[in-house]
Swiss-Prot record:
Region A, residue ranges: 1-328
Protein's organism: Anaplasma marginale (strain St. Maries)
Gene Ontology MF term list: ATP binding; ATP hydrolysis activity; ATP-dependent protein folding chaperone; unfolded protein binding
Region (Disordered): 484-508
Protein name listed in UniProt: Chaperone protein HtpG
Disulfide bridge partners, by residue number: none
Keywords from the named record: ATP-binding, Chaperone, Cytoplasm, Nucleotide-binding, Stress response
Chain segments carrying region C: 559-638
Gene: htpG
GO cellular component: cytoplasm
């Protein structure tokens, strides 16, 4: 060794080194990722420069990265045969934080962006992550076209030395790390393999590990299939890659592969699974799309490159323009991530919409697996256009559904009756109970279709989404007489008028009795109801519950109470079908005999029945049973 020169790091480097070692990175594994990325950059540079200067390397020579360990000396070495660095470049690039050679190289060639020249070290701090695990760092390098090599050495204490390497040296760079005593496990073969396959599996150059017997073992696949043209990727390649990143044994239901070359460049290779992943409804709602920068894995945990309501997606997003902060773990420009996220979201929704139109049978399987997750997006803050894009791919059961048929909101609107102003819907626990609900009887009997919502998330989005394509949503629990009057089957204006006149006459004859009985019911039920009225939407059922126009939907209110987010019970309206034989009998009983214990019990039974139908708890199950028993005993006593 000769010509040793000791130098100090540039100003404030001591503080920055401390930041890098103690604060910037949360995962020590990334030091090896950073060193390998630098080696890959060096190979990229040489490959690019070789196009104009073929004396820099032998034609056909393999550019490679080699990892070796010396357990006795606690040394981990990473060597590449890339472009290498001169003495001045060692000082400039390794002696100054945030002044990386890669950034300088890009600036020199910014006049013509080279195809295939992928350089990720855009900030000069990645290298310094080695001091998290090493007490001493040596970098030996010989630049392509030169015959003299140089050695850079530092313990991360604010100074470094540079010297000339005596004797013959080969082109490239060798990084030698003397590991701390408590970081010995980074010399373990399996630990190295895990880090390489996790972060650098798709680096475009082979990464070898020299085994204990001196043989070389290739660690990375070196293939990033998302960088290939989509028509050159076989179905078997897709299946193999999907299974490797998703840990799902089945084949993907759909592949979404695009290369975006607009303002921000990125590639997305996304898969929709054909089965529901086990962690789909994990409380963390984790997304499983991996973020890469030029084929180097960055994260899948702390950056949301897809919205959470698309967390069923598996795959990768790889960007060459993605800005990085000083650390590759913390992305610098959230706005760029948001742009990628918005673009990917649009592409996914477009692909789903096309699939729903072209293959509705297959799409039903997708919807049954992931529809509830996708509808979570409707609850998020977004503009109307984005929300309607989600609604356009949503599918629903309806009162007209046959054998589980699903419809779109577009289908519903196209079938609306003349004069219909709302998309009517009903929330229920399941399809069967919703189809049999008294709430929709009047709508169905008048030919009005009702959307049936049976997922828990439906109660949330219907409270924030007010309309679709200009048509407002309305719960059938808020439907009143005016919503049904104009849809009576077979009515024209004249017959409607005549029927109304006859109805008024009939009502006048029994109005006093009906109003008196309703007043009596209000007295019996007290604060349990806010109102009792004659229903127009009931045709076969006896009673149902309704809510005022602007009140919470019954199912939503119940959920909030269960979650302790609501301490009160909202007002209920009890609706009566006075054409029902039971009500007719009660009206006669009240008219003939007035108030009685039997009538009082029956009034409570009617209200409890309405609560049970809506899934509400009765005030007292014991009282309900006792009243029913008294009514039955009275019946059989006769």
């Amino acid at each position: 060794m000769g010509d040793v020169e000791e130098l100090k790091f540039s100003a404030e480097v001591g503080k920055v080194l401390s930041l890098v070692v103690h604060s910037l990175y949360t995962n020590k594994d990334i030091f090896l990722r950073e060193v390998i990325s630098n080696a890959s950059d060096a190979c990229d540079k040489l490959r690019y420069l070789f196009c104009s200067d073929q004396s820099l390397m032998e034609a056909g020579e393999e550019l490679r990265i080699v990892i070796s360990v010396d357990r006795d000396r606690r040394e981990l070495t990473v060597r590449d045969n890339g472009i290498g660095m001169s003495r001045k470049e060692l000082i400039d690039n390794l002696g100054t934080i945030a002044s990386s050679g890669t950034q300088r190289f890009l600036e020199e060639f910014k006049g013509g962006k080279a195809q295939g020249c992928d350089l990720i070290g855009k900030f000069g701090v990645g290298f310094y992550s080695v001091f998290m695990v090493a007490t001493d760092v040596v970098v030996e390098s010989c630049k392509a076209g030169e015959k003299v090599g140089h050695r850079w050495q530092s313990s991360g204490d604010g100074v470094f030395s540079v010297s000339t390497i005596e004797g013959d040296v080969s082109r490239g760079t060798k990084v030698i790390l003397t590991l701390r005593e408590d970081e010995f496990d980074f010399l373990d073969k399996f630990r190295i393999e895990h880090i390489v396959t996790t972060y650098s599996d798709h680096v475009g150059y082979p990464i070898y590990l020299i085994a204990s017997d001196g043989t070389e073992e290739k660690l990375n696949s070196g293939v990033a299939i998302w960088t290939k043209p989509k028509d050159e990727i076989s179905e078997s390649e897709h299946m193999e890659f999907f299974r490797s990143i998703s840990h799902i044994g089945s084949n993907p239901w759909m592949v979404i592969h695009n290369k975006n070359e607009g303002t921000i460049e990125y590639i997305n290779l996304l898969y929709v699974p054909s089965v529901k992943p086990f962690d789909l409804f994990h409380p963390d709602r984790r997304c499983s799309v991996k973020l890469y920068v030029n084929r180097v894995f960055i994260t899948e945990d702390n950056v949301q490159v897809i919205p959470q309501y698309m967390r069923f997606l598996r795959g990768v997003i790889d960007s060459s323009d993605l800005p990085l902060n000083i650390s590759r773990e913390t992305l610098q420009n959230n706005m760029v991530i948001e742009k990628i996220k918005a673009s990917v979201t649009r592409r996914v929704l477009t692909s789903l919409r096309e699939k729903a139109d072209s293959d509705p049978v297959s799409y039903k399987t997708f919807w049954e697996n992931f529809g509830p997750v996708l509808k979570e997006g409707l609850c998020e803050a977004m503009d109307t256009e984005s929300r309607e894009s989600i609604l356009s791919v949503c599918r629903f059961y309806s009162s007209n559904s046959k054998e589980g048929e699903l419809i779109s909101l577009g289908d519903y609107i196209s079938r609306m009756k003349p004069g219909q102003e709302h998309i009517f819907y009903l929330s229920g626990n399941d399809l069967e109970s919703a189809m049999r609900s008294p709430q929709i009887e009047g709508m169905v009997s008048n030919g009005i279709e009702v959307v049936l919502l049976v997922d828990p998330v439906d109660d949330f989005w219907t409270s924030v989404v007010l309309e679709y394509k200009g048509v407002p949503f309305k719960s059938v629990t808020r439907v009143d007489e005016s919503d049904l009057e104009k849809f009576t089957e077979g009515d024209d204006q004249q017959s409607t008028k005549k029927k109304k006149e006859k109805k008024d006459t009939d009502d006048a004859q029994q109005k006093e009795n009906v109003e008196a009985f309703i007043d009596y019911m209000k007295k019996v039920l007290g604060d349990s109801v806010s109102d009792i009225k004659v229903s127009r939407k009931l045709t076969t059922s006896l009673v149902c519950l309704a809510v005022p126009e602007h009140a919470l939907d019954i199912r939503m209110e119940r959920f909030l109470r269960e979650q302790k987010q609501l301490s009160y019970k909202g007002s209920r309206i009890l609706e009566l079908n006075i054409k029902h034989p039971v009500l007719s009998g009660l009206l006669r009983e009240y008219k003939d005999n007035g108030e009685s214990e039997l009538l009082e019990n029956m009034v409570h039974v009617l209200f409890d029945q309405a609560c049970i139908i809506e899934g509400e708890e009765v005030n007292s199950a014991v009282d309900f049973a006792n009243r029913m028993n008294q009514v039955l005993a009275r019946l059989f006593k006769k």
